[in-house]
């Protein structure tokens, strides 16, 4: 049984399980997305944790709906992480 932990060089698996502020290097887990509308192929920038429903500017279709955490993308939309 090993009782020694290397605090300067943690494993990637242990860092992924920690809270975002308790990791060795703090950082946000949110990001921006380029979402393409399935109807008009217009690209809109959306925040990953959007708190309001985002609609397409030209055809007014709903691109994503808010949930408790991350926003849920609508069916047929394609996205790219920025």
UniProtKB/Swiss-Prot annotation:
Q: Give the matching InterPro entries.
A: Ribosomal_eS27, Ribosomal_eS27_Zn-bd_dom_sf, Ribosomal_zn-bd
The answer, when asked if Cytoplasm is one of the entry's keywords, is yes
Entry's cofactor comment: Binds 1 zinc ion per subunit.
Q: Which Pfam families match?
A: Ribosomal_S27e (PF01667)
Cellular localization per UniProt: Cytoplasm
General function of this protein: Component of the ribosome, a large ribonucleoprotein complex responsible for the synthesis of proteins in the cell. The small ribosomal subunit (SSU) binds messenger RNAs (mRNAs) and translates the encoded message by selecting cognate aminoacyl-transfer RNA (tRNA) molecules. The large subunit (LSU) contains the ribosomal catalytic site termed the peptidyl transferase center (PTC), which catalyzes the formation of peptide bonds, thereby polymerizing the amino acids delivered by tRNAs into a polypeptide chain.
Kindly provide the name given to this protein in its UniProt entry: Small ribosomal subunit protein eS27A
Q: Which organism is it from?
A: Saccharomyces cerevisiae (strain ATCC 204508 / S288c)
């Amino acid at each position: 049984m090993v009782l020694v932990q290397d605090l300067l060089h943690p494993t990637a698996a242990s860092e992924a399980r920690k809270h975002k502020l308790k990791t060795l290097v703090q950082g946000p887990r949110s990001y921006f997305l380029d979402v393409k509308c399935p109807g008009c192929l217009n690209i809109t920038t959306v925040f990953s944790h959007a708190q309001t429903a985002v609609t397409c500017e030209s055809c007014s279709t709903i691109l994503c709906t808010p949930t408790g955490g991350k926003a849920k993308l609508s069916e047929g939309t394609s996205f790219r992480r920025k």
